[in-house]
Amino acid sequence: MTTAPNESAAAVFLGRDGTLMREVNYCSDPKQVEIFPGVPEALLRLKKAGYKLIVISNQAGIGRGYFTEPQYRLVEAEVARAVLPATFDGVYFCPDRPDRATDRRKPAPGMIFEAQRDQKIDLARSFFIGDKAIDVECGRNAGVRTILVRTGYGANETQANPDWITDNLSAAAEIILNLNEVSRAK
């Protein structure tokens, strides 16, 4: 799937903690980053199929004063390094605390809409992969298809009613790539 210069691209929006990497309570140290097995390869397959890869992450630890934005950026850089050779097209985060209602904090779709504007994304052809009910809700609120992975909190959040539930990011990528094959065959 390639896009012409004036055409919108499809994207895969990704939760970070519990989806790409093992859940760490308020991860503020790059040494705590532990990418799940198969994640770099799955991301690379999606990238090669033409999907933009965009991380959408709540980072309330900043708003609560548990860590600083520079500390968050160091963790973000380690995640990016750990998934090479795949690369992210964008990383969007919301530092707000949960008690502050904003249009950016998941489950609100503000970060997805921001990425859509920045990256010329066709939401109708896009997906959100996450391990939490708020990831599924965020994706639904933005009008994208949703996949709940059972890594992180996902094993306990199946009531979120995603479009698909799967064990991990590799299996989620397989679903997307198979759907892509079916749509190209039509």
Label every model-predicted segment.
Residues G15-D17, N58, D131, D135:
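Acidic active-site catalytic centers that drive phospho-/nucleotidyl reactions
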Residues L14, K31-I35, Y51, Y92-F93, ...:
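Broad hydrophobic/π-residue packing in well-ordered secondary structure
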